[in-house]
Amino acid sequence: MSTMKVDFYFDPKAGLADAQSSAARAARLGYDGFFTAETSHEPFFPLVLASQVTPDLTLGTAIAVAFPRSPMTMAQIAWDLSQASEGKLILGLGTQVKAHIVRRFSGEWFSPGPRMRDYIAALRAIWNTFQTGAPLKYEGDFYKFSLMTPFFNPGPINHPDIPVAIAGVGPYMARLAGEVCQGFHVHPFHTVKYLDEVVIPRMSEGAKVAGRVLSDVDRISTVMIVTGKDEAEIEAGKAAVRAQIAFYASTPDYLSVLETHGWDIGERLSSLARQGEWAEMGSLISDEMLHEVAVVAPFDSLGQAIRDRYGDRLQRVGYYSLQTTMEWPEEIWRDLVSDTRG
């Protein structure tokens, strides 16, 4: 079993004022990386601040929404961050879903998988022009770039080969990651069975098409956890995780996870969600489902439990906790990170 890297996920509700202190805390506790998400705040600004105080941490987006931004805009942001972090950036990209792209970003939604493939190829063409000064000539199915003058070219940097990781749930994105990416962000609503039967085989197929091997692409994910110092604390933490599992399971985008296990509750949960019956939804999540999706263990054995479950299935993990985790003493976190890494 290889060493697992452990990443700190910046609280998506936190503001920029907390970015440097959170990154410093992550470094102090022994984390390998500092990741941000694009939810209620922009994902790149915290990484800029973190790069100034934690030079040893890998920095990454998990994820930034690709389609509202031109590949040119994304290429420039990533270029500057790679330079600021001395090559420690992992650019994590996601498609989001149609409702958000159309109604929240006022964008257009079409062919998300093939469009993401084109997006990544465009990024790399732009980066090549930045680094070499070669004329920019990219003609893809969705994106076309043909103008780059010296005034707008940022010029070469020391770490131009920026790793790209994409997020996804279904087979297409897993296959695409295996073919053209350096990482794949596995959604936290997953199980070992789903990894073994869907994600990893599709990634292997993609890697083979490109003449690569599976180990060329890291699998990255947050892992839902339920923990505590005793059984009472663990039991108290289960309700919130059941509710979160129910929320994901009610969404058609994640139906493939349910189908892998033969869990026939998706339609019922979707109906309850439409009615706003959130409390009842959590009660439909069985103990079997809870333990398949989440790692349930006390503090002192949680790290080993994560390693036992995932082995070489995941190369980078973060903790997805719905408990009051920031109140736990730092020594607990330090030991957990060390135990998880192995």
Annotated model-derived regions:
Residues 1-342:
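Active-site-adjacent structural elements that line small-molecule/cofactor binding pockets in enzymes
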